């Protein structure tokens, strides 16, 4: 639903809504930390001293995970073969938006290789001592390394994620004792060279679908391989110069990652992106895996030096909307590059991640560990997934002695709003029950991973999704992702329509038709300035200035937003256009078609209903837009 006003100069809008140890030769002083890296193998995730504990867990609380791992390893082939490393073929594909040709930005098939399975077989060998598993792991590594080099020769990425290659490096470390020097060299030298080849650099070839994501992202692309490559090969006498370089560069990147994430967390908790599919998916692996491998290679637990990371479960808790119809599938208000099809919170790895937070922070921050335990116990899957096969043998199992908070303590928290500064998210709620009212407001983000052009946007949930983030990312080959879903028009924001204004850039397929060239009144990259935030047991008040985001077409774009507990909202906008002829629009998106009666709009979704009363401007025109042919 759009409220459109084309008067000159300034528009003022107000809406009330009711709802819901190795010493490196020749290192300098800055590399003194290298002296703490142990000389022996294994040293990645566990070492000679901690291995008995790992094995004891495998024979005790994690026995089921061990038995399942052994069964998988028994089914793996004796002679593993890799595939799908040939040249990428560009072709015509059909999408919801029509037919177009794939490009270097289009997702491609991953190389079929055996890095992850080699790590499993390496663990199986260490658990059982049976040489058949050692031989499987060795052959898998040799075959995979050859495939990595073939893929590079064909200018294609092995995988968007570094996971399987990190595990290949771990597998080498874990079976090192069982290999001859020649066997070690045959694996580690080309493996480390592959890691070097795929790093970006002057004069190097472009690689199709290579993930170069740095510390601001999930850090699961090719830069993340450096630490593990260096740690696996350091001091082995085969490629020492490259190993030392990787170790140093990887260590530097990982420390920058930890600082970036710790600083971004603030005093409330955040993790690089406000999109749960990322922050509750693969993003935590980067810091946890560095914590694990630093601990196993040096004996030092770094976690206490980064206290902000302990707070991430707090963001999960505030993002979480209890689902009355299916308690195992909590909801959230929808944000950024998540699909927005069900707005289901990404809890598939909730047990795994919360168990990690407990493992590393239970002594440094007992309260955060208790909250993590509370969320862990609500995870629908009470086990650790097998992406990182060593995880079940390092932590988890609920034997950590951390007492979760009671339901009453979680449901009756007196605080009704939280400002996650780094994410630019204000989360408001009347309680923490299925029938409570939930709301988000977006302003002032400094962490912009997978964030849209949506400053001053709000969403409302009461029994169901009432004021929503619209659009969906689809399968990453549709034009909707770039030209609607990510743009201001898909959000509950203000538009100032200047004719033929270039559309802001976003990722996704490029459309060369006229619809793909021009902005529809939205904002550009940047962050709004938060002017005020106050919360108490009666109301929450937010004021935010997004003027600068609209560029020269805008003289003022200030939104004041009030949540009157439990379920009334007031939205007041001051909007000024530099050109009086530029149209202005106030957007509100619903799941279903609303009913408009005079200046009142009513929208239903499930058991929820939103009443929207337009107060100002006096001559506002209310217009419904949507339905077949006007979905975007």
Where are these regions (language model features)?
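Bacterial N-terminal signal peptides
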Residues: 14-22
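Bacterial Sec-dependent signal peptides at the C-terminal "C-region" and cleavage site
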Residues: 21-30
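Low-complexity, Ser/Thr/Pro/Gly-enriched N-terminal "stalk/linker" regions
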Residues: 29-101
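Aromatic-lined, polymer-binding surfaces characteristic
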Residues: 43-45, 55-59, 63-67, 78-85, ...
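Surface-exposed intrinsically disordered loops and tails
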Residues: 87-102, 260-274, 507-524
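Carbohydrate-active enzyme catalytic cores, enriched for enzymes
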Residues: 233, 282-466, 627, 632
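Catalytic and substrate-binding regions of extracellular carbohydrate-active enzymes
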Residues: 380-631
């Amino acid at each position: 639903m759009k409220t459109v006003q084309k008067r000159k100069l300034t528009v003022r809008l107000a809406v009330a809504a009711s709802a819901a140890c190795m010493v490196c030769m020749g290192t300098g002083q800055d590399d003194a930390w290298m002296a703490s890296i142990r000389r022996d193998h294994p040293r990645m995730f566990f070492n000679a001293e901690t291995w008995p504990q790992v094995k004891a867990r495998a024979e005790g609380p994690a026995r089921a995970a061990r038995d399942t791992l052994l069964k998988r390893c028994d089914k793996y082939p004796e002679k593993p073969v890799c595939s799908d490393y040939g040249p990428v073929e560009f072709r015509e594909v059909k999408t919801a938006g029509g037919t177009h040709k794939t490009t270097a930005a289009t997702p491609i098939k991953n190389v079929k290789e055996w890095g992850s399975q080699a790590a499993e077989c390496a663990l199986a060998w260490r658990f059982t001592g049976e040489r058949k598993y050692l031989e499987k792991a060795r052959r898998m590594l040799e075959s995979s390394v050859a495939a990595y080099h073939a893929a590079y020769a064909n200018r294609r990425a092995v995988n968007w994620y570094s996971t399987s290659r990190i595990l290949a490096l771990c597998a080498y470390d874990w079976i090192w004792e069982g290999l001859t020097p020649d066997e070690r060299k045959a694996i580690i030298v080309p493996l480390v060279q592959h890691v070097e080849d795929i790093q970006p650099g002057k004069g190097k070839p472009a690689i199709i679908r290579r993930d170069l994501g740095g510390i601001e992202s999930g850090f699961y692309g090719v830069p993340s391989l450096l630490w593990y490559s260096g740690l696996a090969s350091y001091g082995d006498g085969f490629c020492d110069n490259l190993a030392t370089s990787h170790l140093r560069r990887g260590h530097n990147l990982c420390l920058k990652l930890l600082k970036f994430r710790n600083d971004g967390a603030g005093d409330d908790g955040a993790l690089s992106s406000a999109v749960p599919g990322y922050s509750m998916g693969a993003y935590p692996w980067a810091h946890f895996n560095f914590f694990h491998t630093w601990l196993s290679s040096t004996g030092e637990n770094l976690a206490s030096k980064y206290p902000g990371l302990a707070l991430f479960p707090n963001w999960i808790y505030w993002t979480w909307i209890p689902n009355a119809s299916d308690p195992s599938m909590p909801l959230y208000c929808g944000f950024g590059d998540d699909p927005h099809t069900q707005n289901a919170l990404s809890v598939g790895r909730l047990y795994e991640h919360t168990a990690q937070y407990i493992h590393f922070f239970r002594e440094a921050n007992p309260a955060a560990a208790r909250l993590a335990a509370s969320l862990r116990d609500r995870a629908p899957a009470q086990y650790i997934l097998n992406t990182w096969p060593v995880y079940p043998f390092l932590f988890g199992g609920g034997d950590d002695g951390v007492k979760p908070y009671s339901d009453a303590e979680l449901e009756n928290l007196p605080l009704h709003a939280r400002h996650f500064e780094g994410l630019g998210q204000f989360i408001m709620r009347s309680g923490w029950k299925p029938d409570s009212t939930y709301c988000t407001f977006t302003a002032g983000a400094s962490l912009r991973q997978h964030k849209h052009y949506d400053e001053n946007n709000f969403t409302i949930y009461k029994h169901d999704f009432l004021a929503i983030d619209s659009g969906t990312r689809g399968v990453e080959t549709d034009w909707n992702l770039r030209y609607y879903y990510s743009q201001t028009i898909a959000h509950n924001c203000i538009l100032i329509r200047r004719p033929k204004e270039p559309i802001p850039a976003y990722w996704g397929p490029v459309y060369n038709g006229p619809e793909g060239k021009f902005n529809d009144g939205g904002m550009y990259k940047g962050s709004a300035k938060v002017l005020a935030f106050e919360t108490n047991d009666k109301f929450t008040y937010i004021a935010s200035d997004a003027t600068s985001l609209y560029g020269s077409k805008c003289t003022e774009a200030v939104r004041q937003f009030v949540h009157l507990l439990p379920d009334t909202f007031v939205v007041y906008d001051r909007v000024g256009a530099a050109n009086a002829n530029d149209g202005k629009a106030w957007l509100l998106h619903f799941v279903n078609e609303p009913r408009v009666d005079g200046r009142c709009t009513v929208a239903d979704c499930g058991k929820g209903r939103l009443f929207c009363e337009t107060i100002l401007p006096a001559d506002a025109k209310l217009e419904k837009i949507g339905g077949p042919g006007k979905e975007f």
